Amino acid sequence: MNDFLSKDDYEEPKCLLNMHPEVTSIPVGRIIDKLDFYLSRNDHDAAERHLRYWLSEAESCHDMRGKLTVLNEQIGLYRKIGKESECLRAVSDALSLADSMDIEQSLTYGTTLINAATGYKAFEKAQEALPLYRKAKTIYESALDSNDGRLGGMYNNMALTLTELGMYREAEELYQKAIKVMEKQKNGELEVAITYLNIADLISARDGLENGEKEIEKQLLEA
C-alpha cells in the first residue's frame, strides 16, 4: 500500500508560493478519480493526504470552486471513517466558503448544504442538519426536474433527520415523495425498497413495535 502522494497526484496545475494571483483551476476530475482509487483500496490515510494536498493547491491557485469541491469530498471522507472533529471543521469551512461565493441559488450550493447536513447527522447533530436540508430542498425543487433522482436522495436523507427529531408526519410525506421519484429511476428498485424499510423504522419509532406491527409488516412486504 502506497502511503505517499505519487507524481501523478500533483504534476498538473500548481501555484508555487502563490506567485501567480490569477485564478488557475485544479484538476477536479483527476482528483476525484484518484480519491476513488484510494477508497477502492480502503487506503484512507492516502485519501486524506490527497485531499489535504489539493485543498492547499486550490487555495494557492485562488480556485474557490475547486476548494469547495475538495471540502465537500473531505466531509464525505471524514464522515465515512468516523473522524468527527475533522468532518465538522470541513462542514464549517465549506458552508463559510459557499456563503461567500454568491452561489446561493445554485445546485452546487444545494449539494454543499446536503453534504454538510449529512455530516452533521452522522455525528448526532440532527438539529443543526435540519435547517440545511430545508434550504437545500428549496433549491433542489426549484432547479431540478421533479423526477430527478437527486431529489429522491435528498428527500430520503431529510426524512431520516426528521424521524430522529420526532417529526414523523413530515418525514413520512418526504418518504412518499422519495418513492415516487425513485420508482421512475432506472434500477431504482433498491432505493425504493430502502425507503419502505425507512418507513417501517419510522412507524416503529412512532408507535412502538407492538402497536405498529401490522403497518410495519405492510411496509416490509412492499420492500
Each predicted region: which residue ranges?
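Alpha-helical segment of the N-proximal tetratricopeptide repeat
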Residues: 26-56, 60, 76, 80, ...
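Conserved alpha-helical positions within TPR/SEL1-like repeat arrays
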Residues: 29-40, 69-80, 107-122, 149-164, ...
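Single-residue signature of alpha-solenoid repeat helices
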Residues: 47, 87, 129, 136, ...
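Alpha-helical solenoid repeat scaffolds, predominantly canonical TPR units
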Residues: 50, 90, 97, 132, ...
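Short coil/turn linkers that connect adjacent helices within long alpha-helical scaffolds
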Residues: 20-22, 60-63, 100-104, 142-146, ...
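Repeat-mediated protein-protein interaction surfaces in helical alpha-solenoids
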Residues: 5-22, 46-57, 95-96, 138
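TPR-repeat structural position
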Residues: 44, 64, 84, 126, ...
